[in-house]
Amino acid sequence: MTAHIGLSAQHVVDSLGHPDGASRPPVSAESLSRASELLQSNHDTWHIFFREATGHNHMAHSILTALALGASPSELERAYTDTEAIQRPIPAVDPMILTRLDADPQALESLLGWSDLYSTFLTYFQSQIDRHGWQSVVTTYVFSETPLAEKLLIKLYEGMYHSLIHLGLGIEFGQPGIIAEALAQAAAHEDGHIDKLLLGVEAAIAAKDDTRTETTVPKSLVQLVDEVRSHPRIWADLRFGDRWNRMRDSIMDRAADELIPIAAQFRIPASGMMMMAGEHADLLTIRTAEMASTAAYLAGASQSARRPRKIDFFLMHTVTASLFFSVFNAQEWIPRAMRVRLVEWKGRLDLAFYAFCKSPELDACVISDYSDDFTRDMDWAALYAAVNQEHDDGHVAKFMRALRHAERLSRPYEQHPVWAEHFPVKGNMWIKLARMALETTRHSPPDFKWIMGTGFDEAWERPDLKLAENRGQQGQSVP
């Protein structure tokens, strides 16, 4: 059994790719057709992991993002072929396990984390969607708060949010086949122990029986970032060489108890609302925007004073993922309390990613003062056109698209008398950060496009950065 993936013009119109209708690039019928063919090929041909650990197949992300940014058929082909060589064939379905799952869906719980069962999970979720519809299946397996759903929800946040991004794209573009891929990827994903933080925070709040309704302005995420930096017991002993395992082995296994009291302060009332000056404030919308602004700030403002600018690979993912919480917030079939929980988890886990990068110093001027000769005069449309021609695995385009959406989301609050200090990225900082993302990646081979842990001195000792500095690329250096 295989899902049919087919995109229509309405799917793109309804997407969040272009919040301002006037700036929407045209998407041709040929591009829609080619995107559907490429997504179908990826669905039928390739494993969701190109290697056993941390190797996420980004093809669907790249194709859908390029399409949303107005890609031509040839540019969509580029989005597919850029990473085709590294992919692994999709594994065979295990018929015995599939029969077991059909007979007892709860059997899935004991199979979570088996990456070689991806195809089996995919076939199972496709059959469930065919029978019950994708909204019902996502509700049952992700949002129902059963023991199985809780585990699968946590796994959506594992691996730098990749399964969550995949699910968000599937929902945004109305593609049940992509949604099935996301659920199967989450089920097959390795365990990074992030439940120690996410569930630990909720347990700590419940233990205090703290169900108060917010009546005062809460601490900003930026303030909580400062608190993380002020607690070196969380991050001071991190080792650069551990890279992929730092979140599990160091942050979650050894420092979660230190991080929980800080992360627990990022809260939204279950109703998503708050009384302020006699009026209802929509805290779900406000704090979703704040989360996106803070993620962008962490990604752009964490630099080295000794090297040309580079954006951190891990913090970049916190920005990319931020867009999809607007997708989830727009789904009335998801209970509002669950939509609140999704945003709370994102804000709390972003704090862990900041610690994971060794809590780098932050300087907003790094973003606000940024300029380079190539992108200086580019508007968003020019940036979209340029990034669609880049050889990339989709990361730059996803980052840029998320920034554009976050800019629109944050605009009402950037100068707000109550909320302005919660929004560290303001005005033209958004487009300057997008320009930085393009310029600092466009000449780099895949392994050198990003910094891998910006708070570590070792991350900045790469020969390419020393060479760039010696060549006098001061336009990209920190003032």
From Swiss-Prot:
Q: Name one Pfam family in it.
A: Questin_oxidase
Q: Which pathway, metabolic or otherwise, does it act in?
A: Secondary metabolite biosynthesis
Cite the EC number.
1.-.-.-
* Region Disordered: start-end pairs: 14-34
Task: Tell me one GO molecular function of this protein.
Answer: oxidoreductase activity
Superkingdom field: Eukaryota
Recite the UniProt keywords alphabetically.
Oxidoreductase
Summarizing the function annotation, the protein's role is: Baeyer-Villiger monooxygenase; part of the gene cluster that mediates the biosynthesis of the tetrahydroxanthone dimer secalonic acid D. The pathway begins with the synthesis of atrochrysone thioester by the polyketide synthase AacuL. The atrochrysone carboxyl ACP thioesterase AacuM then breaks the thioester bond and releases the atrochrysone carboxylic acid from AacuL. Atrochrysone carboxylic acid is decarboxylated by the decarboxylase AacuI, and oxidized by the anthrone oxygenase AacuG to yield emodin. Emodin is then reduced to emodin hydroquinone by a yet unidentified oxidoreductase.
Record's PANTHER family?
A: BAEYER-VILLIGER OXIDASE MDPL, PROTEIN, PUTATIVE (AFU_ORTHOLOGUE AFUA_5G03330)-RELATED
Q: Which family does it belong to?
A: Belongs to the AflY oxidoreductase family.
Name recorded for this polypeptide? Baeyer-Villiger monooxygenase AacuH
Which organism's genome codes for this protein? Answer: Aspergillus aculeatus (strain ATCC 16872 / CBS 172.66 / WB 5094)
Q: Which gene encodes it?
A: AacuH
